[in-house]
Amino acid sequence: MPKFDYAKAGVDIREEERAIKSLASVIKHVRSGFGRPILTSHYAGVIDCGDFGITITTDGVGSKILVAEKMRKFDTIGIDCVAMNVNDLLAIGSEPLAMVDYIAIEKPDEWIMAEIAKGLEEGCRIANITLLGGETATLPEIIRGFDLAGTAIGWVKKDAIITGEKIEEGDVIFAIPSSGIHSNGLTLARKVVEAAGLSYHDKFGDKTIGEELLTPTRIYMEILDVLRECEVHGLAHITGSGLLKLKRLKNMKYVIDKPLKPQEIFRFIQKLGEVEEAEMYRTFNMGMGFMVILPEDEADKLKKLCEGRVVGYVEKGEGVYVKDLRLDA
């Protein structure tokens, strides 16, 4: 089997970044006064509402939906939709409050919609947010199957926004485990599985391959306790582009010298598709779904609040390294 990477699977992150820059370069209007933006181009945006900021972000489930369709199992992708949005709000120090969903569908199906709703309800329960409403669009000439996305809002005190600017040399990187593949890298995972001639119904441990890939994205509500108890310098929700998400923070050198052990699904994909190690870490979370950057003397306090451990450190310089591999070379 030929070697796979994300671009060969159909998702070129660099091409996507160029397209996003092209879009952003045209949009110039900015509101002033009440509601003016005080943070943009981060995990979430923040608008000024006096003593506090309203935070907002939007995200979707991506091609995980195609696995759900193959398995005819739709009751957990709603959790993924909530998680992808809520975790991005948490990643700037914001408390999530509410969200709306958007479903674009080829043909309305009552059973599928009810199953999606089960996951949305469970995700909202875990995150303690309200689903205020949403939009369902029937688009038979545009959509094959359906797409699921959401937009979430939260709040944060303006002096408590976490951007990563406080990160300094000597800080440590604490990783909180993921529940599995989450909602990123599924295009590569699917291409590898399908090219190998495997079925999503084939056994994978005590589950099937499809069931393992559909494991819901973890919602990291413990971050709110971490923010109350610890001196946090930076937060990273590890999603698309994997550990390169650390580059969204302050321009420093991030060294992951003792990564958490990835779940078996990652090594399965890597071996099956002959995917290079660096490509794995810049595509998947590799068992590390959320990262907290903080002073070394705060790490023991953090360990009492959430699962995980210190996996690396911050130095002057630039780049993201896993052991001796530079991911952004």
Curated annotation (Swiss-Prot):
A Pfam family per the record: AIRS_C
Main subcellular location: cytoplasm
Coiled-coil intervals: none
Catalysed reactions listed for this entry: 2-formamido-N(1)-(5-O-phospho-beta-D-ribosyl)acetamidine + ATP = 5-amino-1-(5-phospho-beta-D-ribosyl)imidazole + ADP + phosphate + H(+)
Subcellular location: Cytoplasm
GO molecular function: ATP binding; phosphoribosylamine-glycine ligase activity; phosphoribosylformylglycinamidine cyclo-ligase activity
Metabolic or biological pathway: Purine metabolism; IMP biosynthesis via de novo pathway; 5-amino-1-(5-phospho-D-ribosyl)imidazole from N(2)-formyl-N(1)-(5-phospho-D-ribosyl)glycinamide: step 2/2
Gene3D superfamilies: PurM-like C-terminal domain, PurM-like, N-terminal domain
EC code(s) of this entry: 6.3.3.1
Similarity annotation: Belongs to the AIR synthase family.
Full protein name: Phosphoribosylformylglycinamidine cyclo-ligase
Organism: Archaeoglobus fulgidus (strain ATCC 49558 / DSM 4304 / JCM 9628 / NBRC 100126 / VC-16)
Lineage: Archaea, Methanobacteriati, Methanobacteriota, Archaeoglobi, Archaeoglobales
